[in-house]
Swiss-Prot record:
Keywords: Amino-acid biosynthesis, Branched-chain amino acid biosynthesis, Leucine biosynthesis, Lyase. Its EC number is 4.2.1.33. Gene3D superfamilies: Aconitase, domain 4. It comes from Methylococcus capsulatus (strain ATCC 33009 / NCIMB 11132 / Bath). Catalyzes the isomerization between 2-isopropylmalate and 3-isopropylmalate, via the formation of 2-isopropylmaleate. Belongs to the LeuD family. LeuD type 1 subfamily. It is an enzyme of class 4 (lyase). This is 3-isopropylmalate dehydratase small subunit.
Amino acid sequence: MKPFKKFTSRVVPLDRANVDTDAIIPKQFLKSIRRSGFGPYLFDEWRYLDRGEPDMDCSHRPLNPEFVLNLPCYAGARILLARKNFGCGSSREHAPWALEDYGFRAIIAPSFADIFYNNCFKNGILPIVLDEATVDRLFSEAGPGFELTVDLESQTVATPFGETFHFDVDASRKHRLLNGLDDIGLTLQHADAIRAYEAARRKSAPWLFAVP
């Protein structure tokens, strides 16, 4: 994973509550476990006017002109602003894969489904919980050109008007995002200790390593 740095970005306002993982990435795309290449199919049923299929070339598909992700003013945005219970439904990890592959690094919402929330941290996305009144205010301001600054180190979201909102994040998850560590990377931080344990184990219980 890429280390999570402080950044400023335009904000995509997805003004829908209870967005489930099937809306984020429909079930027909779950056959692949490549972890990459899902960005073009993010919000597929809302984003396009036809039905998407795995490995389909999306460059010529008819776009839904009313869907917020298709509006040119939000192109390149890395922050998604959402409503409560974002990521509900099935536990598919493809949902954060698609969001990350599209380019989102942070999602702001009043609440998230638990499994989706956990999966975001494992895939380089920062899910930020702000109270509903604050999210309402951000939606009222999130027109074309509106930007926010996300600073994980200080655990703050800042507006262009000088307002700053603090968010909570578990210390271990913060460490992982700041250092770009997935589960494998976190384990490799203890590589020397693991090798030392294996070497000691071979001496104390050599029969476990005997080759027939």
